[in-house]
Amino acid sequence: MLIALFALAHLPIFRKTPLSASSSPPPSVHRSPRCGKASTAYHPPPADACISITASAIDAASGMSNSAEQDKPIAANGNAAEPQEIEVIHFQAQEKQCCRVIRSNKTKVLTSGGVHTRGSSKVKLKNIVDYKWERKYYYPGHLVAVHRDGKHLAYAINVNNKATGMEGMVRVCNIATSMRALIKGMSGEVLDLQFAHTDCERILAVIDVSSLFVYKVDQIEGNLLCNLVLKVEDPIANYVPEYDMVSWCPYVCSSSATVPINDDDDENQLLIWSRSSQFQCFQVKMIVSEHGRGKIQPAALESGYLKIEEDSLITCAALSPDGTTVAAACADGLVRFYQIYLFDVRNHRCLHEWKPHDGKKVCSLFFLDNINKPVEESYWQHVITTSDANTEIKLWNCSLWKCLQTINVVASPSSLQPRNFIAGIDRSANYLVLSCLDSLAVYVMQIGSTGGADSENRSSDSEGEGCDTSKRIQNVAEFKLSSGILSFSIVNASMRRVKNSIESYYPIEEPDDFDDDSNSTSALVLHMFVVQAKSLQECQIIYQPCVAEKTERSSLNSKRSQTPEDNLLIKEEPESPNSGTVGAVQLDALFAKSAKRASTGSSSAMVAVAAAAAAAPSAILQDATKEAAKSESPQLSSAYTQQVNLMTPDAFSASGTAAAAAVFVSTSTTTSIGTDSSTTTSGQDRSIDSAVLQTIRMLATVTSKTSENPNAEVLLNLMNNTLIEDREQQKLKEKLDARKKFIAIDRNPERNVAENLASGSSSPSREVQEIMATQDDADAYEAELENLDDDDDDEEEELANSSPLPEAVDGTWPIVKLSSHSAELQNAAQIMSQAVQNTNNGNVPPTLGGGHNNNTSVGSNSNNNTATTLSTSNTSSSNNAGGTCVDSSGTGELNAKMELLIDLVKAQSKQINKLENEVNKLQKQQEAAAALHSKQDTSLEPKNLSQLAYKIEMQLSKLMEQYLKRYENEHKKKLTEFLAARESQNRELRDSVLQVLNQYVMNHFTDIIGNVLNMELQRQLLPRVNANMDQLQAQMQVEIVQKLSVFDKTVKENIAQVCKSKQFLDTFGKSVLIGVQTSLQTAFIESMSSTLIPAYEKSSQNMFKQLHDAFSVGIKDFMVQFNTYLQHMPQPQAGSGNTEEINNKLSMLKQLVESSLHKHRTELTDAMLETQREVKSLEILLARQVQETIRAELRKHMEAQNVAMRSQAATPAPPYDLRDSIKQLLMAGQINKAFHQALLANDLGLVEFTLRHTDSNQAFAPEGCRLEQKVLLSLIQQISADMTNHNELKQRYLNEALLAINMADPITREHAPKVLTELYRNCQQFIKNSPKNSQFSNVRLLMKAIITYRDQLK
């Protein structure tokens, strides 16, 4: 009762406030939106959501718009606020409120912690496919794509193939007919897939690492067929996919076009493929018409194709709906807009370039164009960009290239890891959806348009001024999930009629399911398909979005009409200045007869205001009448609507599961103010409580004697003036804060614990328990405060719309009616006390009369009827108070209480009908009496009237004080009893909760703790351990490498010192000599016996055989000649003459034999010398072979020794490189040895290497050639072996080598002819094959020199 007195003392009718002070509510007062209380740090003063009076009309009516208020900065949403302040929206983990209004241009959204174990009841999930996808935070594209019809679905899967490794596939299915098809042939993982935005055809684009596939999905004879239309192969070398994506053009033809929309338009089949630092545009229809279906290379395309290279990695790309512009965002933060022209692959132009996020990488880019229907405006006027893993969201105006709004999504302070979000937008571009794998939540942001009327209220620094319409993110909603989302695809999002229950909504699928009497309301239905770690699910999010109080109904209607599925609006009719008809009214506001929660404060607040109005002094009303008369002008006439929430008896009998739920009826009434108004509307737009209306009518009767009938109407209409209502409602709300604290005793913290232990699904028993529970939450109380203000306005509207009661004939009429009014005042006080009591008790308030009846004007009533109604209400209230505690096993008792409650409501309804009939009769009698009294002289002296009014006021005040004191004492008693009952109830509930909690902990604590520990170990401990292990491994590797390098250096130094010591060299030489001696002797003996001796024996044998043959043949010839000579010689004569002749001949024979012997001796000597020279050459060759053999053996032993020594140091032996050895020899000046080693390798590349690194002047010095003859011959042979690569260097060395040949050397004379013949043949081949070579003339000169040398060697 103290709260009621406090509220009565601060009502508007007890204060004399100037009219100018009520033109606007105080800027510090914040009204909570209909969806609930937002815990925000920034509270700009909202304008009334139902007032549509222009600023000029308000200035004319109030006359108080000063320059100080006009100069205040105004935010983009029309609110006076500091532009530098940032609005903070914090979603709590356990709160029920899911949607928050965004009022500022800079907003920070704090997400919940993501520690919940169950999802929101507003999210409906239906399992489609069970498949395990890899759980990772970022996929470059979409894992699932849905066609525009919402029936055909495609999702990517990976199959491990033993032959080819991981193979990507795409499953296409029709969820309506359960037909499926599988697409194969992708190399590696499927990176992205998208359906084209067409209605008739189903065209699917799929990309992998190096290829683009376009398939056409057809349904033929009950089978789903996927036919390949186009395959573009364009691999990039050494490319690792990071931001690969494919996107179709969301083409929408102009609304002014006369040709209907055709799915075969070229723009419908335009797609963009972005990857690495390039993106490619393909016109599929044009390419197929020119090149046919199948594989194609981009290089072969001359039209229908465009490729653009960027400077850095492309993170995202999007096509405008008109198909003429593509926007590409890069990793360096730049976004470029290109104009595309597909008939020329080299023709493209950059339209604009800008950095939307100050150089930060742009993650997503969305054009805010409704692709569901044509529009009048040009496209891509607004765009949304995101950065920082889609946590920073900016809304841009592309006409001015300025930012309209910025929203930062920040993880809650309890979160340890930053959030990585994935983003998507629906086809109407009205809803932006964000999801995070860690937070286990989905965030929906509603994007709306602000019309030209709002543009007047924008600030001068608003980025969207100058445009007729501007986009704005109006609210954000958070929905918890049981598991995170890897990828999603949105089907559509629209406002629909849904069936509502206590905690959730269900969409009405068929039109026959809906009727005006069904339990339904209008809500947003977001339909999409989501991919989770273990399944693919169909998801529906159903909720009622928040609307800021300043947002007008017209803007909401225009925004909601953008979706083609939403046809639940009534078009706005034009209003005349003096008309009182209702404007654009939403059907969800007119026919939403129920809400999901009970409100315990609306009826009680309404009764409190009505009872307070009963004590209004008439003098104050007269002052208000004079001020209202001053503001009358033709320019002031305007219509406004006021939406209120009233509690009806239907709330207690609507359904079985929610029998005691409080139900609101959203109505709209319109009042016209003007000078030409002479009559008021007699019909009522909604039902009014009889007791409240009687009290207000009594005030109207008291004040009717002081003025004429039109002035009384103006006085009553003044009560509905919104300029006064706003200020008074705000002050009343401030005073009711104390009441909020007083009612706070109704909070029961144990209820949240019980709810958390309950199942996530909705059950009838749980809903009944929540309905009949005694505690109240913060959302219901906020709704109570709103309804209190709205009911006050609506009661005054009823007073304004009702006709005034007739006056009394003489002065005794007020005295006769005084007792009746006293009884009515007593009844009003009882109702007010009962409302306060019910509010404190947390019960559903009693429903007053007239909850169902419309168009009814209730006059005065008899005391008996009023007492009967009040007794019924008290009985209902007591029954409700007795049934607040519902035991889990008391279902029968609950049903009995429900039936009793329904019976009481029926009885009350019957009594209300009777009262209405009696009121109608009384009204007719009063009208007749008024007609009779009007004929008589009704003039009363002003003095008697003022005295009468003063007496009535005094009596009413005294009676009110008496009744308030009496009911205050009763209320204290009842409150004491209630607190005792409440304490016992809390004690029982606490015991039951503890028992249930203990049992639950004993049964599930181990499993839950195990799961939580495993999850936390994987999420928290494992990454940190891995990071520390990686650091430790890196440190160990660095230390090991350092230590190994130091150890290697030390070992090398020690080995070098040991090898250089004389003792080691002596020991090593002895050991090598001992080890090699036997092998060398054996090799020497074998070489002598197998090579030298046989060759010498063979040559000697041949020589002696030739000598024997020569002597034998010579002697035989001599004997033959000698015999012949003897035969021809004459017979010897006797005497001395013959003897002398014989002696002469013998002497001649002797000389001849001696000469022959001398000749043969000379030849034999020459042969022996030749043999000796050959033996010497063989000795030289043998000695060299023995030296090489010894060196090879020594080298092998040295290498074996080095390997053994290095193996002890645990380091690998360095590879032996001939080029390094040759370089060392050349640097040491051992040119012959270097060439010898290079020629022994039989590697022409090594020979060329030696030629390049040797100075020819040093090798062929003037004092003599430093190369041996065998080295020269080998060099000539190997250089001439490959004349195809002959060059100047080789030619120079050939010339020098030929000049250095020593013809006297036996080795040269033996082998030079063969080498020169081969060189001559190769030169001939070179001249034949390369006649135009630069070395042609030099080779010819070389050939002449070869001929000269060959002649010398012959």
Curated annotation (Swiss-Prot):
UniProt region (Disordered), positions on chain: 18-38, 552-581, 788-811, 838-884
Phosphoserine: residues carrying this PTM: 32, 561, 576, 759, 762-763, 1207
Keyword Cytoplasm: yes
PROSITE patterns: WD_REPEATS_1
Biased segments, Acidic residues type: 788-799
GO cellular component, as recorded: P-body; pole plasm
Composition-biased stretches (Polar residues): 554-565
WD repeat ranges, renumbered to this chain: 309-348, 363-406
Protein family per UniProt: Belongs to the WD repeat EDC4 family.
Subunit and interaction comment: Homodimer. Interacts with Dcp1 and Dcp2. Interacts with Gyf.
Annotated protein name in UniProt: Enhancer of mRNA-decapping protein 4 homolog
Gene: Ge-1
